[in-house]
């Protein structure tokens, strides 16, 4: 299995995320984080919400794959507990997660993905990545009946 977390951000590798990457390998899952922040995104965010959202879509579109489950993290999307999250990931070999910038996703991009919300609360990118990585590891623990999730 391969899970890739794409986000509009300048830098990532947090120590806690690295530990979840290592733990996911126990379940033969490569957990990768890719930060994207094209030059046009910085400029677009200064101009308007719509241009910012469009720049996020343009940055992410090359990574949308018909051979993968594509999941956009969106605060107004469906949410569920860790068991529901594990069901969503189960039986998929390649999963792409997308975390937009401050202005969120264009509706058009959301239609190309399954949208999922981590919480009703708003998180910084760093916290969202940590929560997402922990939930991926927890989902794998549930799928493989490892005692971590209890």
Curated annotation (Swiss-Prot):
Principal subcellular localisation of the protein: cytoplasm
Keyword Methyltransferase annotated: yes
A GO cellular-component term linked to this record: cytoplasm
Entry keywords, A to Z: Cytoplasm, Methyltransferase, rRNA processing, S-adenosyl-L-methionine, Transferase
Gene3D superfamilies named among the record's database cross-references: 3.40.1280.10
Cross-referenced SUPFAM superfamilies: alpha/beta knot (SSF75217)
Reactions the enzyme catalyzes: pseudouridine(1915) in 23S rRNA + S-adenosyl-L-methionine = N(3)-methylpseudouridine(1915) in 23S rRNA + S-adenosyl-L-homocysteine + H(+)
EC numbers, comma separated: 2.1.1.177
Record localization: Cytoplasm
Binding of S-adenosyl-L-methionine, residues: 100, 118-123
GO molecular function per UniProt: rRNA (pseudouridine-N3-)-methyltransferase activity
Classification via PANTHER family: METHYLTRANSFERASE (PTHR33603), RIBOSOMAL RNA LARGE SUBUNIT METHYLTRANSFERASE H (PTHR33603:SF1)
Family designation: Belongs to the RNA methyltransferase RlmH family.
Subunit-level organization: Homodimer.
Known function: Specifically methylates the pseudouridine at position 1915 (m3Psi1915) in 23S rRNA.
Classification via HAMAP family: 23SrRNA_methyltr_H (MF_00658)
Protein name: Ribosomal RNA large subunit methyltransferase H
Designated gene of the protein: rlmH
